[in-house]
Amino acid sequence: MGLFHKKDSRSHDSRNDKAAIRPSVTIDKLSEYSIRSPKLVSDSGSNGHLPRMVTTIPNNVEIPPAPDPATKPAAYLRSIQSVRERSRLVLMRAKSNSLNHFNVDMSKFQETADYVMSIIKRDYAGDYANIPPHGRWQHFEVGGRPRVTQLLQSWPTTIDNQERTRRLIDLFLVSVLLDAGAGTSWSYKSKESGRMYSRSEGLAVASLEMFKAGYFSSDKNQPHQVDASGLKNVTVETLAKGMQVSDANPMSGLEGRAGLLIRLSSALQNPELFGTEGRPGNMIDYLMSHPTTQAASVPVVPLPTLWSVLMDGLTDIWPATRTKIGGVSLGDAWNCTTMPTSPPAEAWENIVPFHKLTQWLCYSLMVPMTKLLNVHFAGAELMTGLPEYRNGGLLVDTGLLTLKDADAKKGLETYQRVTPSNKAVEVVPMFEPGDDVVVELRAVTVGFLDELLAAVNKGLGARLTLAQMLEAGTWKSGREIAQVSRPITKGPPIGIISDGTVF
């Protein structure tokens, strides 16, 4: 990871060398790193692609408004609507270059949009409608190997689509919860192919192979499931074994991941949402029978109904140290000094919510439900861009955002403190997840992703959904520009000390 390159045995400050990473300069070199997101092989008749998710609300599907923050601040900050509304306040300050920790060069915005468009054109020119939505499925298929399709084909034909979807949701939920940043040193060698993978794809392949081996199931006769009793047996040691973690192959946040799965075991003991078995996949039965679900030619589920299952049903999995209001844990929501407040400020006014892992769950779980059961989600446009290090790193690496000097100095001191001297390469400012620098960056990332979607669609003459732009554009662009800017670690320009529960 690094804002700085190692060159001639000296640290080189890439913040002052933006020309080296501008899209127009690097696009030819970047092409060697990327592959087109794989088609998701489906049943015959669907042309190998997922059905498109509903992005407009049918007239007869009512989307409930967010709770009133004045009377129910905790409920409001846990709602999906609050993420965009609160982050937009930070975006407004960014546009006037009045952030606390970053300088904003709006002249770089169009360059950033042009770079994202160049990546999308390179991989999908003339085929924009078939860009898959951002989700965990694509990570499983790294290297062009259709692992999810092969998993589906391995099950007897007597297993109906509802149970197949339950099993995929079991897998996807655990895999997403394990998807926090693993660090730049960890990798995984697939037991099936012998190939090495790292980062999100490595975590995806590792979690899939653990799932197939029955790590998360209490039923020896049915290893391909996740249940509360099976998760009770998870320990740091078993997770380390499954993830191939060792002194020579360290993973950031291993203990945090294990703790998340152990707490998930308790959260799944909710028969109304997850059945008597305590399986994540049983949420399908809850959603299909929910009074807000409309069963017309296809099932139509309001997005807030799925959101409620994940936010309310999984509340107990988040660390006890997370921000609270009135004793209610808010999950991935943090105090931010950039938030405007009205005197006398209420406690909730300083908080900006992100709910990144919950949103990543939503994006990922909608895919198998849409693909196998043809479920449509009304109100999917309430989802936001994901405030994580690839999307945020893109804004920094293109020069749209530049960390202020005092914060850069503080972050570099943290890097030197937590990084062994013999492993200090491509040095970057580093911060804790709750640091005001990180919270401000995440908030402005959510806002700028909305702005980029409008600019990208205008430039391409397309109608991409936000989920499609995340998949084919910003997430991939953030990764590729990082690979060129920091070719050793391929990490983001601002480092996060991962606890395994945020990113």
Regions found by a protein language model. Give the residues of each.
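Extended, well-ordered protein cores
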Residues: 4, 8, 14-368, 372, ...
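Long, intrinsically disordered, low-complexity Ser/Thr/Pro-rich regulatory/activation regions
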Residues: 406-430, 434
